[in-house]
Amino acid sequence: MIDYILLIISTALINNFVLVKFLGLCPFMGVSKKIETAIGMGLATMFVLTVASLCAYLVEHYLLTPLHANFLRTLIFILVIAVVVQFTEMVIHKTSPTLYRLLGIFLPLITTNCAVLGVALLNINLAHNLTQSVIYGFSASLGFSLVLVLFAALRERLTAADIPLPFRGASIALITAGLMSLAFMGFSGLVRV
């Protein structure tokens, strides 16, 4: 049990996919202008990452490895992720049309979010079992969602701030992301990985 807690902490905080591994930067910068949108994108990504980790483990161990088709891993994982994203998109469209409109093009772009594919491939490379794969996917999405919501809150505050003209827009957003990355580096001594 303690191993799973350490896996959650190390994946969500210490080895954060956005601030440490630099995966998932497109939705991080694109959807982080409003907190409501960031929360919706975080929840959608959380669902997709967790389910995609489960599906990728099952496909790897029950389809690709027995058939010695490991060379197709990336292609098959992209197809699995696309199916999971389509399912998520249909659910959000039926349950919350407002959130569906707010997320816009970024919802189908979860398919090409490199963090989702990165988690699936890292699960295989780290030789996680089924439980560890699901927890790793959930933890990565938890860290992604946490950073996304915190960054959206900071960007909302920045819109009200008096920022010099050369730093407005993407410049101050990148500076803020860099400062967040420095803050998350403070967690690096928390757990030995």
UniProtKB/Swiss-Prot annotation:
<keyword id="KW-0813">Transport</keyword>
<comment type="similarity">
    <text>Belongs to the NqrDE/RnfAE family.</text>
</comment>
<dbReference type="InterPro" id="IPR011293">
    <property type="entry name" value="Ion_transpt_RnfA/RsxA"/>
</dbReference>
<comment type="function">
    <text>Part of a membrane-bound complex that couples electron transfer with translocation of ions across the membrane.</text>
</comment>
<feature type="transmembrane region" description="Helical">
    <location>
        <begin position="72"/>
        <end position="92"/>
    </location>
</feature>
<keyword id="KW-1003">Cell membrane</keyword>
<dbReference type="InterPro" id="IPR003667">
    <property type="entry name" value="NqrDE/RnfAE"/>
</dbReference>
<keyword id="KW-0997">Cell inner membrane</keyword>
<keyword id="KW-0472">Membrane</keyword>
<dbReference type="GO" id="GO:0022900">
    <property type="term" value="P:electron transport chain"/>
</dbReference>
<dbReference type="InterPro" id="IPR050133">
    <property type="entry name" value="NqrDE/RnfAE_oxidrdctase"/>
</dbReference>
<keyword id="KW-1133">Transmembrane helix</keyword>
<keyword id="KW-0812">Transmembrane</keyword>
<dbReference type="Pfam" id="PF02508">
    <property type="entry name" value="Rnf-Nqr"/>
</dbReference>
<protein>
    <recommendedName>
        <fullName>Ion-translocating oxidoreductase complex subunit A</fullName>
        <ecNumber>7.-.-.-</ecNumber>
    </recommendedName>
</protein>
<feature type="transmembrane region" description="Helical">
    <location>
        <begin position="134"/>
        <end position="154"/>
    </location>
</feature>
<keyword id="KW-0249">Electron transport</keyword>
<keyword id="KW-1278">Translocase</keyword>
<feature type="transmembrane region" description="Helical">
    <location>
        <begin position="171"/>
        <end position="191"/>
    </location>
</feature>
<dbReference type="GO" id="GO:0005886">
    <property type="term" value="C:plasma membrane"/>
</dbReference>
<feature type="transmembrane region" description="Helical">
    <location>
        <begin position="5"/>
        <end position="25"/>
    </location>
</feature>
<comment type="subunit">
    <text>The complex is composed of six subunits: RnfA, RnfB, RnfC, RnfD, RnfE and RnfG.</text>
</comment>
<feature type="transmembrane region" description="Helical">
    <location>
        <begin position="39"/>
        <end position="59"/>
    </location>
</feature>
<feature type="transmembrane region" description="Helical">
    <location>
        <begin position="102"/>
        <end position="122"/>
    </location>
</feature>
